Amino acid sequence: MNGNDLIRVISFNLKRDFGLPLNRSHKWSERRALAAQYIRESGATIIGVQELLPNMREDVSRLLDVDYSVLGFGRYSGIRPQSDEHSDIIIKNDSAKVNLIKTFWLSKEPEHLSRAYYAIFPRICTVAEIYLKDLGRSIRVFNTHLDHICGIARTLGIRVILGYMERFNEERALPTVLMGDFNAKPGSRPVRMLHSQLEEFPGIHLTDVYSRVEPSEVHNTLHNFSG
């Protein structure tokens, strides 16, 4: 894609309640309208969200209405309806349409409900092939939420994602976006892997968007409900 083929994408951890005592303003019921407002006002064509529980998904779909589509599948494949956390991809319908949507697991059996050996929960990645109406072309978007405890599980997750990127590109090469909540610091091994040219994935070349923006525009993605 060249400089004229610009689109806006954002990654947004919506923060589930977890049943812990929270300040009232931190509860999802108090934040949902603001979250939907932020998505609308961002002007983003594609939004990757994390920690999206089924009740939150219903709220987001209702508040964004027909202007957006919320796409993806839960990490428990619907087996646990109340806690089936999603890492969905949201698209703005007047600017994009989805030709393919798929969710896979970040484990050694990524096509089946499973988890990495050291991971507390199953972790997933949602991938979508999205046609951009204004540009007349398609891109592929991966959205994920890596394990919050175990570095080994995060590293495995990145390897699984890169493997899927390579296989998808062998079938049909497309410009690709990877976004999500990596639960990792900039110098950590999972992030370094994404910066490196890995011998086992010779066809994958990723650019860190933080390297393309002014330092004043770089912010920590851990927002702590502060904006």
Per-region residue spans from a language model:
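Sec-exported extracytoplasmic/periplasmic mature domains
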Residues: 40-44, 61-65, 166-170, 195-199
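His/acidic metal-ligating clusters that form di-metal
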Residues: 124-142, 151-194, 207
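Structured beta-strand-rich core segments of catalytic domains in phosphoester-bond hydrolases
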Residues: 46-142, 146
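Active-site metal-binding loops of divalent metal-dependent hydrolases
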Residues: 12-14, 144-146, 180-182
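Active site of divalent-metal-dependent phosphoester/diester hydrolases
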Residues: 69-92, 107-111, 118-122, 171-173, ...
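Active-site environment of divalent metal-dependent phosphoester hydrolases
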Residues: 17-19, 52-58, 148-152, 183-191, ...
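A short acidic, helix-capping loop that chelates divalent metal ions and anchors anionic groups
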Residues: 17-22, 110-113, 217
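N-terminal, active-site-proximal structural segment of metallo-dependent hydrolase catalytic domains
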Residues: 1-64, 75-85, 159
